[in-house]
Amino acid sequence: MAEQTQLAPAAFHLPDLVAIQRNSFRWFLEEGLIEELESFSPITDYTGKLELHFLGKQYKLKRPKYDVDEAKRRDGTYSVQMYVPTRLINKETGEIKEQEVFIGDLPLMTDRGTFIINGAERVIVNQIVRSPGVYYKSERDKNGRLTHNASLIPNRGAWLKFETDKNGLVWVRIDKTRKLSAQVLLKALGLSDNEIYDKLRHPEYYQKTIDKEGQFSEDEALMELYRKLRPGEPPTVSGGQQLLESRFFDPKRYDLGRVGRYKLNKKLGLNVADTVRTLTSEDILAAIDYLINLELDLGGCEVDDIDHLGNRRVRSVGELLQNQVRVGLNRLERIIRERMTVSDSDSLSPASLVNPKPLVAAIKEFFGSSQLSQFMDQTNPLAELTHKRRLSALGPGGLTRERAGFAVRDIHPSHYGRICPIETPEGPNAGLIGSLATHARVNDYGFIETPFWRVEEGRVRKDLAPVYMTADQEDDLRVAPGDVATDDAGYILGTTIPVRYRQDFTTTTPERVDYVALSPVQIISVATSLIPFLEHDDANRALMGSNMQRQAVPLLRPERPLVGTGLEPQAARDSGMVITSPVDGTISYVDATHIEVTADTGEKYGYALQKYQRSNQDTCLNQRPIVFEGDRVQRGQVIADGSATEKGELALGQNILVAYMPWEGYNYEDAILISERLVYDDVYTSIHIEKFEIEARQTKLGPEEITREIPNVGEDALRQLDENGIIRVGAWVESGDILVGKVTPKGESDQPPEEKLLRAIFGEKARDVRDNSLRVPNGEKGRVVDVRLFTREQGDELPPGANMVVRVYVAQKRKIQVGDKMAGRHGNKGIISRILPCEDMPYLPDGTPLDIVLNPLGVPSRMNVGQVFECMLGWAGQLLDARFKVTPFDEMYGAEASRLTVNAKLSEAREQTGQPWVFSDDEPGKIQVYDGRTGEPFDRPVTVGRAYMLKLVHLVDDKIHARSTGPYSLVTQQPLGGKAQQGGQRFGEMEVWALEAYGAAYILQELLTVKSDDMQGRNEALNAIVKGKAIPRPGTPESFKVLMRELQSLCLDIAVYKASTEDYEEDKEVDLMADVNQRRTPSRPTYESMSVGDIDDDDD
């Protein structure tokens, strides 16, 4: 391909896209951990004679035991050991013992922003939560009167809520308990009436509360406080004092955090030092004063919008980990105190006091089972990148799906340039999980900032550094979008400019604009910014497009898009899938697995490439060098491609020839018709690597053995196994083939009667083992690419009870087939309905057959017209041998810029190729197409172009499934559901109605009995089918018996009787006490021999 053409200047260079993860973890190592270690030091015992100090600033980390690759291979955790110098002081003797103590393992972040936990790569998702601070809210009571309340929310500790009522009284609630008068709290804090009146701007409002309640002295107030918080206990002044102290003034119990203090000072106009993290009486008075002003509606005060991003902050890895470390250290503190008390003070040493277990457990729990620690989505590089930039409102301390209303999920004006308004899941999590916008960054307080250019008297100052602002700072400024037109000197063109001001969209003159957004892609996320012509798509479809790009399977031969947005190289680079040169230099050595760069200064840097590794999603991770020996490289240049990248650019799909036309109904309802070329030429072929694992365990009857001596298996089935019974690398396996031979010892009871008989006759002791081999599951086939053996002797850590673990990796090439799901980048998705031979596909005037035929009805109602622009510009690109980068939102280059650009490029292509049919002025973008079967032209010209289509991870191979007999549920005895359980197809209530409507009585009877949960009936039916006899009459479904048992458990005497004569006989139809079968195995039907007399042929 020729060099790419820029149709718009590239967006301002994006910042490092994974910085949010790395910076947060760096902060944890440099500050967060030290902060925690110092906050809980010193620990004194209950008598006060022993003190244990932690010197947090001098903590050390020892080198990791394994590197990243080794940790993955051994199922280990990539972590470092933490050591802290401690000092134990005995105050009685003055003796000081110093020692370095091990306090636990800390998982370490890899340079890609992930963690390796038990061999799996995981990501800690950023959580977006309500910021600590004070929030004012107005509510209407049932009489329609407006009342106000204020909530003081700390980082941790008790909530304090102030409210006014219809009589104009001020009340306080502590931690949502009973309300008490504000006067009680203020007096209990030790404030005198004069001090209170001095601080309030409208003391007369507060006076009403005193008139109603009467005066309280400080002691009375403390007693009243105790009475309200601890009803039923005798109140004391000291008890009230202690209660108040521990609730709001003890730094261990109450913490506003740096952010809470900053927000409180800002909202209430205070000047309290930011080291004071607990409440002060000044805070409480100022909060009440603000509430009274709000109630009197005197201006200068306003209620808060809790969904505004100035009131929500991001907690990233570092902070989440810090909170978890705090939990662990608190448990540790308790243990240390107990040990100090119990042990003899002379023999004590810091090492004997500190037990690393509680801290290790807390950290393990966080990484292993927290809602925010997620198995990384590694389907392709974009999925990985997006996962690290995800913002979740769920998780500990956040919202739950059920409780979250519409307001929280909605797009808020303050999201502009901070959270992407488009990328969010469909379904119950919509709006609760978002993605960070491309240029957004998180500041020290956890608020999201976004950059702007300063505007001075109508001129955009791009020569100055961009200014980063939080949502709060931006509120009172007039900010124009990033696609306003400017002249060469930077002056804004036009007389009325659209701006955002105080969360509203208005217009103003260029002179009054304060700031301009940095770039048009600033408001959207990385995945969304990869959609060309995004501005022509409906938001719902753009959402699907963003989400489906993350599900694209890496293909065998990746191909860059002809029409991109210019952000593909950076997305690939920051995902960590490609290798970049660290220095300016020369390539001194390169082969398929290794690259060496020699810097100009003489140092050598070596890189081992990942070859055909399995990703978390079973896709294939493979790196290929794209440089040659002797090439000059610059710092940051891509030297090796990863999966789904080409020449250092993201390449998720393929450019293929597409036409929008109906074809024999095969593209009805979004179905897709494709050409055989896509199968034969491996255009959409992907490699999938699956892991199969088996462990040999220690059982009661002896150890399980991995061996090729398997009972009742022919030599043919063992031909691919080595002498240990393990498949050899390179073998081709299909479903049912043995991968690892394993035998399990079995006891006497396990033997079937025929074996007992043989042993009784011949007295020969058959080998008492059962075949328990690992076999290839149904519907799978492929080539064995790797076998790994783990044993205790080699020093591997195995699960308890296992002697050996064998892992077999099987790779399969999956070509595209009917039932696979494909999609474009604009939310246009569909299932392949038919694969046509090339000669039957419609063809162009020059004889080129189409690759894919899409339904034109998929465009107008869905309003994703971007796909039409893309396919036409792609067509021009192919003919001109050029690639285009189209920045989204291109109206700054003139009205209808997209259409004019595409038409201009198509005309150019017509001129260059000399083919008039390429672009017709009468029917722009449409071409006469011929039917491949008859050679006749179709009635009307159709839209033809090159579209970038992806193959998604929802492959039909993983979904198709059949069951003849299989496992049954224990309680209902009905077949299980789902492919993984070898389940059946659920025939639900509505499906039964459909059969009832047709009166299909026998099909219905079978469905509800022998095919489902009539245990005796299904065994008999199976026997009858095997022997070729008539199927006997069905019995009673087990679920009916369960219902009867439940009714009987409610003491209802219920039974079902046969009606043989007018006067009913006591002949039970369903006998719950009769055992169906003494020797039945509940999970599978048994073959029982039946005499001919058992089957009544007349019953038919």
Curated annotation (Swiss-Prot):
Domain of life, source organism: Bacteria
EC number: 2.7.7.6
Reactions catalysed according to its record: RNA(n) + a ribonucleoside 5'-triphosphate = RNA(n+1) + diphosphate
GO cellular component: DNA-directed RNA polymerase complex
Annotated S-S bridges: none
Enzyme class, spelled out: transferase
Coiled coil: none
Compositional bias annotation for Polar residues: 1079-1089
GO molecular function, one term: DNA binding
GO biological process terms, semicolon-separated: DNA-templated transcription
Keyword annotations from UniProtKB, A to Z: DNA-directed RNA polymerase, Nucleotidyltransferase, Transcription, Transferase
Residue span of region Disordered: 1064-1100
UniProt xrefs under Pfam families: RNA_pol_Rpb2_1, RNA_pol_Rpb2_2, RNA_pol_Rpb2_3, RNA_pol_Rpb2_45, RNA_pol_Rpb2_6, RNA_pol_Rpb2_7
Family: Belongs to the RNA polymerase beta chain family.
Quaternary structure annotation from Swiss-Prot or TrEMBL: In cyanobacteria the RNAP catalytic core is composed of 2 alpha, 1 beta, 1 beta', 1 gamma and 1 omega subunit. When a sigma factor is associated with the core the holoenzyme is formed, which can initiate transcription.
Record's function text: DNA-dependent RNA polymerase catalyzes the transcription of DNA into RNA using the four ribonucleoside triphosphates as substrates.
Descriptive protein name: DNA-directed RNA polymerase subunit beta
Organism name: Synechococcus elongatus (strain ATCC 33912 / PCC 7942 / FACHB-805)
Gene behind the chain: rpoB
